[in-house]
From Swiss-Prot:
Keywords assigned by UniProt, alphabetized: Ribonucleoprotein, Ribosomal protein, RNA-binding, rRNA-binding
Protein name: Small ribosomal subunit protein uS4
Native organism: Aeromonas salmonicida (strain A449)
Ranges of residues in domain S4 RNA-binding: 96-156
Gene (UniProt): rpsD
Keyword presence, Transferase: no
Assembly: Part of the 30S ribosomal subunit. Contacts protein S5. The interaction surface between S4 and S5 is involved in control of translational fidelity.
């Protein structure tokens, strides 16, 4: 399955919440009716079954992190094998993706842009170029923008936008050096309360 390249606002409207697929600090509900699904009949809301609710939650999280269906299922399997809460393990695996860490550090305005930076070899981990967006970053790893990419206007613009957002506590960033440290895995309380990972666990447990 190919990645979705259509209108980003349409995906957020489909899920009824801001998926943070657009750059900027202004909430997208100020731009469009976020609680109304796209399309001619978007205002009609059918009552979802339990399965439908679980499926929507899975799709929402998958779209937030820009992960394809097969990848997402593999993440769930890995999370289920680990000790502890499967849902929290899943979120930590998604948060540990290099493209997501680049986004959290502010080098990319969106996860999609951060994925592109990684793919274009603009990012280094512990002094080595890594061009795999799904690369798992470990605690204490140092992530930085490659020297020849530091002049890119989009990276500078992203850091300015990131400066206006609430900073994640599990990463530490030196904006001047365009370098950051992944201090620890985020705890559940660090992440969005809008995500109900238990619904995803229930979906895949069937």
């Amino acid at each position: 399955m190919a990645r979705y390249i259509g209108p980003k606002l349409k995906l957020s409207r489909r899920e009824g919440t801001d998926l943070f697929l657009k750059s900027g600090v202004r909430a997208i509900d100020s731009k469009c009716k976020i609680d109304t699904a796209p399309g001619q009949h978007g205002a009609r809301k059918a009552r979802l079954s339990d399965y439908g609710v679980q499926l929507r939650e899975k799709q929402k999280v998958r779209r937030i992190y820009g992960v394809l269906e097969k990848q997402f299922r593999n993440y769930y399997r890995d999370a289920a094998r680990q000790k502890g809460n499967t849902g929290e393990n899943l979120l930590q695996l998604l948060e540990g993706r290099l493209d997501n860490v680049v986004y959290r550090m502010g080098f990319g305005a969106t996860r999609a842009e951060s994925r592109q930076l990684v793919s274009h070899k603009a990012i280094m981990v512990n002094g080595r170029v890594v061009n795999i967006p799904s690369f798992q970053v470990s605690p204490e790893d140092v992530v930085c923008v490659r020297e020849k990419a530091k002049k890119q206007a989009r990276i500078k613009a992203s850091l300015e936008v990131a400066g206006q957002r609430e900073k994640p506590t599990w990463v530490e960033v030196d904006t001047a050096k365009m370098e950051g440290a992944f201090k620890r895995l985020p705890e559940r309380s660090d992440l969005s309360a809008d995500i109900n990972e238990q619904l995803i666990v229930e979906l895949y447990s069937k």
